[in-house]
Design a protein with these regions (language model features):
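Conserved glycine-rich cofactor-binding loop
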Residues: 9-10
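Short C-terminal tail/terminal secondary-structure segment
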Residues: 73, 129, 208, 219-232
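Active-site helix of classical SDR
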Residues: 104, 141, 149
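Alpha-helical segment proximal to the catalytic Tyr-Lys
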Residues: 109, 154-155, 216
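Residue(s) in the substrate-gating loop at a strand-loop-helix junction
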Residues: 124
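Short, small/polar-rich loop/turn modules that mediate ligand/substrate recognition or access, typified
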Residues: 157-162, 218-220
Length: 232
């Protein structure tokens, strides 16, 4: 299958790119700067999602699956000045949620011409459990992804357009390592019944399954991969 994967330069995205490629899929990956073979798009620019979609479509010819993985995890204190607070919220929502919505809208239009397709959104445990006092905006953006996923699943199933989400907990990526180090890794690990954080390859395999093998009746499903640190 032809797949567009955002946020493919590191962590979960890089692992997913490798997993999907190894499974025989044709994948166009994205990063902010477009290092190597990755296509460049800075999602803080409102025009970037459409430009990326058009470039990926030109390269692949058609797209069967969109994986929205790109995101930022940046702190903002609740006592920041108004300008900094609003800037942080605007940036996080633009990159984590608006860009995913824009790409999903373009994917829906394309999928309708091809008899269907799949969207896999990479959200977070924070969508349900919340996050730190410095990361309201991050949790809110990921909760928005869940609501968007369910809306797409319900609204477009009749067109054979399926939507799924993955909610990782702590995963061995640069963002998680920084977070664990800043907040006391041992204490946080004690809150994970499995006793360890997830490996990026575990999230990647979940994404691969949703992108290619999950049954159609599972559309709208949100898969938790968090070592039972949050159970819904």
């Amino acid at each position: 299958m032809n797949i567009l994967l955002t946020g493919a330069s590191r962590g979960i995205g890089a692992a997913t790119l490798a997993t999907l490629t190894d499974a025989g899929h044709r994948v166009v990956g994205h990063s902010t700067t477009g290092a190597g073979a990755l296509l460049a798009a800075d999602f803080s620019d409102p025009a970037a999602p459409r430009a990326l979609w058009d470039e990926a479509l030109a390269e692949l010819g058609h797209i069967a699956v969109l994986v929205n993985n790109a995101g930022v995890f940046e702190a903002i204190a609740d006592d920041s000045d108004d300008a900094a607070w609003h800037a942080a919220w605007s940036r996080t929502l633009a990159i984590n949620l608006q860009a995913s919505a824009d790409l999903s809208r373009l994917a829906l239009a394309h999928f309708r011409t091809r008899g269907g397709g799949r969207i896999v959104n990479v959200a977070s445990r924070a969508a349900y459990r919340g996050d730190s006092p410095q990361h309201w905006h991050y949790a809110a953006s990921k909760a928005g992804m869940i609501a968007m996923t369910k809306s797409i699943a319900r609204g477009y199933a009749a067109d054979n357009i399926l939507a799924f989400a993955v909610c990782p907990g702590f995963t061995m990526t640069g963002m998680a390592e920084e977070y664990l180090g800043s907040r006391g890794g041992e204490k946080l690990l004690a809150d994970i019944p499995l006793g360890r954080v997830a490996d990026a390859s575990e999230i990647a395999e979940t994404i691969r399954w949703l992108a290619s093998d999950a049954p159609a009746s599972a559309t709208g499903a949100v898969i938790d991969v968090n070592g039972a640190s949050y159970v819904r």
